[in-house]
């Protein structure tokens, strides 16, 4: 695997010739569609197929996978143009083995709205280890705000992807409320009710883990929040269900700001089975032009 950075005058075909790779494979692995416009500075993923097969009449993905000594999930990963569909046709060329395998394991997870395009999701799930439908909120009484997540759970199950219940401060009115979170964190009985409802929903729907994302809590609620996370973990642990806590991207313990002060890295890390650094909050629609997650900024958070 390598990364090629587009230079002035490059085309998909000139890059393919220079790298000894069919332009069609470049397009396939980078989600490019005709007329294959490229931007100077754009990074292209370069993967070299080591083995391919031409689909014959009567072939299915299952039969091709068996003949190639692989599985259908791997075929989906090596052939993103399939978009998770099992529809193939005679004469189609499928990759059954890449020249270079991944050198180290990676865990890939993501969030998805319930109305996400099925085609988009099917194209992504073969590469994912976990999927969190976005999002479950809660009422002032500690009940979960319902979410139409059945379709996403079915797709995750079909692709062998672990479903995570995402818990946030969403209200029944559809807005995120730090005030409602504050009321919860100051009421131990309400926390017990919410924890029980979370567990019940996870067991009923087949969720295999919990991802908690409470933001803009402020310094005063940092320790109560960590205690709530510990309560959730203690509730889930007997059932073998892990808890992940989303952390705001901090670079120092004293970093000012309501978003950062509410997340005590040490306390939350101790109370959680795993943490997710939300290092995707820099580049956004209404901010200055930049990458969603600039490498330098991400590195500073990880090093802290």
Predicted regions and their residues:
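A cross-family glycoside hydrolase active-site/sugar-binding cleft signature
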Residues: 111, 132-134, 164-168, 211-215, ...
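Primarily a LysM-type cell-wall glycan-binding module
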Residues: 1-19, 42-69
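Solvent-exposed loop/turn segments at secondary-structure junctions
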Residues: 114-117, 136-140, 169-174, 216-220, ...
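Glycan-recognition patch characteristic of GH18 chitinases/ENGases
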Residues: 99-192, 197
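Substrate-binding surface in catalytic domains of secreted glycosidases
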Residues: 140-147, 223-304
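Active-site groove signature of glycoside hydrolases
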Residues: 193-224, 274-288
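Intrinsically disordered, low-complexity Ser/Thr-rich linker and spacer segments
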Residues: 42-57, 62-63, 83, 92-109, ...
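Second-shell loop/turn segments in exported
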Residues: 12, 54, 61-64, 138-146, ...
């Amino acid at each position: 695997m390598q990364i090629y950075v587009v230079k002035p005058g490059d085309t998909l075909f000139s890059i393919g010739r220079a790298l000894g790779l069919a332009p069609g494979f470049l397009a396939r692995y980078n989600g490019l569609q005709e007329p294959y416009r490229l931007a100077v500075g754009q990074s292209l993923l370069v993967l070299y197929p080591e083995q391919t097969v031409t689909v014959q009449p009567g072939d299915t993905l299952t039969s091709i996978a068996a003949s190639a000594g692989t599985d259908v999930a791997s075929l989906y990963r090596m052939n993103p143009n399939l978009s998770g569909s099992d529809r193939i046709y005679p004469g189609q060329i499928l990759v059954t083995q890449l020249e270079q395998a991944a050198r180290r394991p990676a865990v890939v997870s993501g969030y998805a709205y319930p109305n996400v395009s099925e085609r988009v999701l099917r194209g992504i799930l073969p590469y994912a280890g976990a999927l969190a439908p976005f999002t479950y909120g809660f009422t002032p009484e500690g009940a979960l705000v319902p979410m139409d997540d059945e379709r996403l759970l079915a797709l995750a199950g079909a692709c062998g992807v672990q479903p995570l219940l995402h818990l946030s401060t969403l209200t029944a009115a559809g807005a995120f409320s730090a005030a409602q979170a504050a009321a919860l964190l100051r009421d131990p009985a309400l926390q017990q009710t919410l924890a029980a409802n979370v567990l019940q929903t996870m067991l009923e729907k087949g969720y295999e883990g919990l991802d908690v994302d409470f933001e803009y809590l402020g310094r005063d609620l940092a320790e109560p929040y960590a205690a709530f996370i510990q309560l959730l973990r203690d509730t889930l642990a007997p059932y073998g269900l892990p808890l992940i806590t989303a952390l705001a991207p901090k670079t120092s313990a004293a970093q000012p700001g309501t978003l950062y002060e509410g997340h005590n890295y040490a306390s939350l890390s101790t109370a959680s089975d795993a943490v997710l650094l939300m290092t995707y909050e820099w580049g956004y629609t209404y901010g200055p032009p930049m990458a969603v997650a600039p490498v330098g900024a991400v590195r500073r958070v990880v090093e802290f």
